[in-house]
Amino acid sequence: MTETVNSARATARFVRVSPMKARRVIDLVRGKSVEDALAILKYAPQAASEDVAKVVASAAANAENNFGLDPRTLVISEAYADEGPTMRRFRPRAQGRAFHIRKRSSHITVVVESQKGSAQ
């Protein structure tokens, strides 16, 4: 029984960007080809686009090196950002008060899938 694998995944954990901001960038590239997604992310003004681009490139490299898939046929089938641990900090304020600061982190996951007809 030989099973053909046509998808690969990559995950970046503990990325220091809030999940809400990461999801905003991920929504730009979900469903696009890997080449298009990397081009979009290269010029996206959001700070999280660099981290998402690294995960997309890593998923494409995993597909090519581990499963022998053609990188030109890869499409982002799944992409999501889950919440990671939150670092809690204090900001000293006037008259002995302190404000809470929550430094959020994300776990970014991208799954790429080979679409046979999308090679041009």
Curated annotation (Swiss-Prot):
Keyword line: Ribonucleoprotein, Ribosomal protein, RNA-binding, rRNA-binding
Segments traversing the membrane: none
Q: Name one GO cellular component term.
A: cytosolic large ribosomal subunit
> What does the record note on quaternary structure?
Part of the 50S ribosomal subunit.
What is the role of the protein in this entry? Answer: This protein binds specifically to 23S rRNA; its binding is stimulated by other ribosomal proteins, e.g. L4, L17, and L20. It is important during the early stages of 50S assembly. It makes multiple contacts with different domains of the 23S rRNA in the assembled 50S subunit and ribosome.
Give the family this protein belongs to, as stated in its UniProt record.
Answer: Belongs to the universal ribosomal protein uL22 family.
Q: Report the NCBIfam families cross-referenced here.
A: rplV_bact (TIGR01044)
Question: Per its record, how is this protein called by name?
Answer: Large ribosomal subunit protein uL22
